[in-house]
């Protein structure tokens, strides 16, 4: 089965991450999906932006015009991203914080069919809410939380996340590639959870994971490299 290749925040080696230009380039480079982050502004707009704050001011406390002014960028709204990508590529939409799960999914469903996007998050509760209200939406738990308050407890819950996954009824898991140890992939297979690994940028690792039948897909900043390696791998397998 062909691995799914997901452009991490668009083609960010060509254009600034999470911009319309980066997303357009990812489409042209034949990515299968685009991954991006969604937050809500003070004036209730959904914007595509990774960081929690700008100049120490939380995104949730800023209006849209201020965000663009502070970043010196045309930060895209979710509406703009969907209009650009609709019918051209599927979306991997990461919800960054709690409190607007139902609103954002309802908004997305105004434009997209249920099979045209997935929702991912580090936050168990957000995914639980979405699955309860929208059972047909595919959800995925992201593992590999940066700078956790309790590193040991957090890492153990990420290396052995399957009880969490059952509780919130996710469809797949998205571990950081460094978590693929101590039998992680074997356990995921036992629990019948597809694995989408992030963020895989080294050519050696991309090749390794493309060849691993236990991995369903890769999230990468190097989408052009990954697409080419996948094509080469498929040609190799067609040779007599």
Q: Could you describe each region identified by the protein language model?
A:
Residues 1-240:
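Phosphate-group recognition and catalysis centered on beta-loop-alpha active-site segments
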């Amino acid at each position: 089965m062909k691995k799914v290749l997901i452009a991490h925040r668009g083609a960010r080696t060509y254009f600034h991450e999470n911009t319309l230009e980066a997303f357009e380039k990812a489409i042209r480079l034949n990515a299968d999906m685009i991954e991006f982050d969604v937050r809500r502004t003070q004036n209730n707009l959904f914007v595509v932006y990774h960081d929690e704050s700008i100049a120490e001011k939380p995104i949730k406390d800023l209006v849209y015009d201020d965000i663009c002014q502070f970043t010196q960028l045309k930060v895209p709204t979710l509406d703009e991203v969907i209009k650009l990508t609709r019918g051209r590529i599927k979306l991997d939409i990461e919800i960054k914080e709690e409190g607007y799960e139902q609103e954002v999914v309802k908004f997305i469903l105004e434009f997209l069919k249920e099979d045209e996007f997935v929702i991912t998050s580090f936050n168990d509760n957000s995914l639980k809410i979405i699955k309860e209200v929208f059972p047909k939406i595919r959800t995925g738990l992201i593992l590999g939380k940066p700078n956790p308050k309790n590193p040991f407890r957090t890492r153990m819950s990420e290396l052995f996340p399957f009880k969490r996954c059952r509780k919130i009824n996710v469809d797949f898991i998205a571990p950081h590639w460094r978590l693929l140890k101590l039998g992680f992939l074997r356990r995921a297979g036992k629990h019948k959870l597809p694995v989408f690994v992030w963020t895989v940028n080294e050519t050696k690792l991309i090749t390794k994971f493309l060849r691993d039948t236990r991995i369903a897909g890769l999230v990468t900043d190097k989408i052009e490299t990954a697409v080419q390696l996948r094509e080469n791998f498929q040609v190799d397998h067609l040779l007599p």
